């Protein structure tokens, strides 16, 4: 993780991005919509290293592409962590499809890896835009799928 930029979408408390900072990530960007979770995220960032945290309260599908666009000319490699909520609430039934579309629309060369956390029963696409599935690790009811940039 050393010297990489980390973006955590659907950040919640920010635990994954903050762990990336503790392992040497240069900076972490967090997107969280829920007001209560966002307040916890801010508190956690202050406790770790606020200088390395950039937070935004807002819609992941709007804010994450803005972060990616902002960082497109960075020489640093980016790791994008996408963790849509498992519990489907009204209006969120298509959360995975929207997440896949967001990933498919990424058109920058400096994203090193995309990690998608998901329910383990979900069959993940082999290809999402410019990114190919490398492996999936299952942990009970959840799983992590790792996508890497595919050179054209």
Predicted regions and their residues:
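Class I S-adenosyl-L-methionine-dependent methyltransferase catalytic core
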Residues: 1-152
């Amino acid at each position: 993780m050393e010297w990489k930029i980390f973006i955590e979408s659907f950040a919640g408390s920010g635990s994954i991005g903050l762990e990336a900072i503790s392992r040497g990530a240069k900076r972490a960007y967090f997107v969280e919509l829920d007001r209560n979770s966002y307040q916890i995220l801010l508190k956690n960032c202050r406790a770790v290293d606020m200088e390395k945290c950039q937070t935004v309260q807002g819609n992941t599908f709007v804010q994450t592409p803005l972060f990616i666009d902002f960082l497109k000319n960075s020489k640093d490699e980016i790791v994008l962590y996408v963790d849509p909520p498992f519990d489907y609430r009204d209006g969120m039934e298509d959360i995975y499809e929207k997440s896949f579309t967001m990933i498919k629309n990424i058109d920058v060369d400096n994203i090193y890896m995309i990690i998608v956390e998901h329910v383990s029963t979900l069959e993940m696409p082999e290809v999402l835009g410019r990114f190919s599935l490398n492996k999936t690790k299952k942990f009970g009811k959840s799983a992590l799928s790792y996508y890497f940039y595919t050179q054209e």
